[in-house]
């Protein structure tokens, strides 16, 4: 990967910063659409501020059905829905954007298809330079992780808490932390500079999804009492 110059970083820092913060719910992989919608409703009712529809096992028809149902639900809550990987599906169902990984389409291609109003998030794993380059290429947020052992994904790369602190110094777009996050370890990431925490198993595997979502949301309210740790004033 090429090195990004300081002049490029300075130009990128002038770009508008989207408000992406709080609990970022990543849906579980299930073929039961009604159950998926019901679980996501509970997460939204508990305070989730962003939803990502992620499915790796379903056929195209069911994938489309679920994405459309979640788009309708998220509009009711006025919460953005992002589609994992699939740009065309995001356009088809009227989702608010996409989340892309290392093997997915480049940001430029996604932006060309989606336009400037849609959200594009990028997985940067444990690579700060990838995040800097993603910002310069027009990403709306970057995701670092895994910070802890993940049940949802077993092929993750470890990321350190210091990466969040360094990210605060180098980039201005929101930073999402991901990987093995639960309500017991999330505050450490938020305090280190994560604008949002992306959670799947600890949220949707909870006995009471709504209460668990509220617990995560409460961590951000708790952090708001420490303005010196906030990135919004940068």
Curated annotation (Swiss-Prot):
It is an enzyme of class 2 (transferase). PANTHER family: THIAMINE-PHOSPHATE PYROPHOSPHORYLASE, THIAMINE-PHOSPHATE SYNTHASE. The lineage of its organism: Bacteria, Pseudomonadati, Pseudomonadota, Betaproteobacteria, Nitrosomonadales. Pathway: Cofactor biosynthesis; thiamine diphosphate biosynthesis; thiamine phosphate from 4-amino-2-methyl-5-diphosphomethylpyrimidine and 4-methyl-5-(2-phosphoethyl)-thiazole: step 1/1. GO terms for molecular function: magnesium ion binding; thiamine-phosphate diphosphorylase activity. Condenses 4-methyl-5-(beta-hydroxyethyl)thiazole monophosphate (THZ-P) and 2-methyl-4-amino-5-hydroxymethyl pyrimidine pyrophosphate (HMP-PP) to form thiamine monophosphate (TMP). It catalyses: 2-[(2R,5Z)-2-carboxy-4-methylthiazol-5(2H)-ylidene]ethyl phosphate + 4-amino-2-methyl-5-(diphosphooxymethyl)pyrimidine + 2 H(+) = thiamine phosphate + CO2 + diphosphate; 2-(2-carboxy-4-methylthiazol-5-yl)ethyl phosphate + 4-amino-2-methyl-5-(diphosphooxymethyl)pyrimidine + 2 H(+) = thiamine phosphate + CO2 + diphosphate; 4-methyl-5-(2-phosphooxyethyl)-thiazole + 4-amino-2-methyl-5-(diphosphooxymethyl)pyrimidine + H(+) = thiamine phosphate + diphosphate. Its EC number is 2.5.1.3. Binds 1 Mg(2+) ion per subunit. Its cofactor is Mg(2+). This is Thiamine-phosphate synthase. CDD domains: TMP_TenI (cd00564). InterPro entries: Aldolase_TIM, ThiamineP_synth_sf, ThiamineP_synth_TenI, TMP_synthase. Mg(2+) binds at residues 85, 104.
């Amino acid at each position: 990967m090429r090195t990004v110059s300081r002049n490029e970083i300075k130009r990128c820092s002038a770009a508008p910063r989207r408000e992406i913060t709080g609990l970022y719910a990543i849906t579980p992989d299930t073929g039961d659409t009604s159950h998926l919608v019901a679980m996501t409703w509970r997460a939204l009712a508990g305070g989730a501020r962003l939803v990502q529809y992620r499915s790796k096992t379903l056929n195209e028809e069911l994938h489309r059905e679920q994405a459309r149902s979640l788009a309708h639900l998220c509009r009711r809550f006025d919460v953005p829905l992002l589609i994992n990987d699939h740009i065309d599906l995001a356009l088809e169902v009227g989702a608010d954007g996409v989340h892309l990984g290392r093997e997915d389409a480049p940001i430029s291609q996604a932006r060309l298809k989606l336009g400037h109003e849609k959200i594009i998030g990028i997985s940067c794993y444990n690579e700060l330079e990838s995040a800097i380059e993603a910002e310069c290429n027009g990403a709306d947020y970057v995701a670092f992780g895994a910070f802890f052992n993940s049940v949802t994904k077993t092929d993750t790369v470890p990321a350190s808490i210091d990466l969040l602190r360094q990210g605060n110094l180098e980039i201005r777009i929101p930073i999402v932390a991901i990987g093995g996050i639960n309500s017991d370890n999330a505050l450490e990431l938020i305090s280190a500079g994560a604008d949002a925490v992306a959670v799947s198993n600890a949220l949707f595997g909870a006995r009471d999804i709504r209460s668990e979502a509220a617990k995560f949301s409460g961590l951000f309210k708790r952090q708001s009492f420490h303005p010196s740790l906030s990135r919004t004033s940068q």
